[in-house]
C-alpha cells in the first residue's frame, strides 16, 4: 500500500477518534419532570366473587400543592449528580401540562414521548439533551407483608390500600386484628432522548408496606392505624429510597 495513503488513513482515524472523545466529553444536560404527586388514591378492597375483575373501590383525592412532586425532583437531582457528576440538571417544578387534561399521559404505547407544544417549548428552552420523567405506573396489587404479598386488583401512582377482612398479626406484640392499611407508590422512571422523543430506558417502582389494624389503639378501622404524618412520611420515604436506584438503572447503557 502506498505510504502516503497509509499516513492519510492514520490521520483520518486519529481525527475521528479525537472527535469521538470530544463528543463523549460533552456533558449531558438533563431536564427532570415529576407527574406522580398531583393526587392520592384510596383503594378499598372488595372481596372477589368468582371473577378476576377489579371490584375494589377507588377514590381519588387531588392534592392542593406540588410538595410530593418537588421532593421527587430533589431525589432525582441527587441521584443524577451521584451517577454523573458532570451532568447539568434543570428541575421543571412547574412544567406545563400536556395538551388537554393535566393528567394526560406523556408516553404512548410505543414508548414515544408526546408532550404538548407548551411543554416541548419549555424543555427546548432548558437546552436539555435528555429528560428524566417520573410518571404513574399501573400494575397488579402486591402489598408487601412480612412473608408474602397481599391484595387484589390493580394500583397506580401513590395512595393507600385498605383491607377490612384480612387477619393480621403484629410482629412485635403478637396482637391480631382484621384488616390493614398499605401505603404504596407505583411509578415509573423514564430516560428520554429529547432529540428523538424516544424512551431510552424505563425502570418501574412498586413499593408498599402493610400495617395491621392491631396498631390502631382505639379503632377497628385500618385507616386509623397510621396518623396523618405517618401516612405522608411513608409515601415520601418510598420516593427517597426507591428513586435513586431507579435513576441509576436508567442511566446504565
Model-assigned labels for residue ranges:
Residues 22-44, 142, 147-253:
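C-terminal/domain-edge helix-coil "capping" segments
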Residues 46-171, 184-188, 192-202:
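N-terminal segment of the mature soluble domain
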Residues 15-19:
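N-terminal signal peptide c-region/cleavage motif recognized by signal peptidases
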Residues 1-7:
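Bacterial N-terminal signal peptides that target proteins for export
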Residues 11-13:
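Repetitive helical segments and hydrophobic/amphipathic motifs
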Amino acid at each position: 500500500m502506498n505510504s502516503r495513503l497509509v499516513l492519510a488513513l492514520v490521520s483520518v482515524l486519529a481525527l475521528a477518534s479525537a472527535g469521538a472523545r470530544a463528543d463523549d466529553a460533552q456533558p449531558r444536560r438533563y431536564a427532570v419532570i415529576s407527574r406522580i404527586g398531583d393526587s392520592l388514591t384510596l383503594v378499598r378492597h372488595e372481596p372477589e366473587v368468582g371473577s378476576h375483575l377489579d371490584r375494589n373501590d377507588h377514590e381519588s383525592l387531588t392534592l392542593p400543592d406540588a410538595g410530593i412532586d418537588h421532593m421527587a425532583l430533589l431525589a432525582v437531582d441527587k441521584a443524577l449528580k451521584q451517577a454523573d457528576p458532570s451532568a447539568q440538571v434543570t428541575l421543571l417544578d412547574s412544567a406545563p401540562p400536556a395538551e388537554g387534561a393535566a393528567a394526560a399521559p406523556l408516553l404512548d404505547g410505543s414508548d414515544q414521548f408526546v408532550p404538548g407544544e407548551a411543554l416541548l417549548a419549555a424543555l427546548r428552552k432548558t437546552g436539555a439533551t435528555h429528560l428524566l420523567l417520573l410518571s404513574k405506573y399501573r400494575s397488579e396489587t402486591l402489598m408487601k407483608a412480612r412473608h408474602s404479598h397481599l391484595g387484589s386488583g390493580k394500583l397506580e401512582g401513590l395512595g393507600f390500600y385498605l383491607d377490612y377482612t384480612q387477619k393480621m398479626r403484629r410482629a412485635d406484640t403478637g396482637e391480631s386484628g382484621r384488616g390493614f392499611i398499605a401505603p404504596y407508590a407505583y411509578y415509573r422512571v423514564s430516560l428520554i432522548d429529547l432529540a428523538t422523543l424516544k424512551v431510552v430506558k424505563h425502570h418501574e417502582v412498586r413499593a408498599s408496606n402493610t400495617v395491621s389494624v392491631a396498631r390502631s389503639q382505639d379503632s377497628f378501622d385500618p385507616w386509623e392505624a397510621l396518623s396523618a404524618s405517618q401516612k405522608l412520611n411513608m409515601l415520601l420515604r418510598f420516593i427517597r429510597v426507591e428513586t435513586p436506584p431507579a435513576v441509576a438503572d436508567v442511566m446504565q447503557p
